[in-house]
Amino acid sequence: GLLDSFKNAMIGIAKSAGKTALNKIACKIDKTC
């Protein structure tokens, strides 16, 4: 239902935000950016 779609959207946003954060951290650590 609507709640499930909302939950899935939130999970998707959280995952992509987490990936971005991890990329920034990795970038600072190994200076590949």
Swiss-Prot record:
Q: How is expression of this protein distributed across tissues?
A: Expressed by the skin glands.
One GO cellular component term of this record is: extracellular region
Which Pfam families does this entry report, sorted A to Z?
Antimicrobial_2 (PF08023)
Cell compartments where the protein resides: Secreted
A biological process (GO) annotation for this entry?
A: defense response to bacterium
Nucleotide-binding as a keyword of this entry, yes or no, is no
Query: InterPro entries annotated for this entry?
Result: Antimicrobial_frog_2
Q: Which UniProt keywords apply?
A: Amphibian defense peptide, Antibiotic, Antimicrobial, Disulfide bond, Secreted
Which Cys-Cys disulfides exist here?
27-33
According to its UniProt entry, the function of this protein is described as: Has antibacterial activity against the Gram-positive bacterium S.aureus ATCC 25923 (MIC>72 uM) and the Gram-negative bacterium E.coli ATCC 25726 (MIC=18 uM).
Protein family membership: Belongs to the frog skin active peptide (FSAP) family. Brevinin subfamily.
- Its name, as the record gives it, is Brevinin-2PTc
Organism lineage reads as: Eukaryota, Metazoa, Chordata, Craniata, Vertebrata
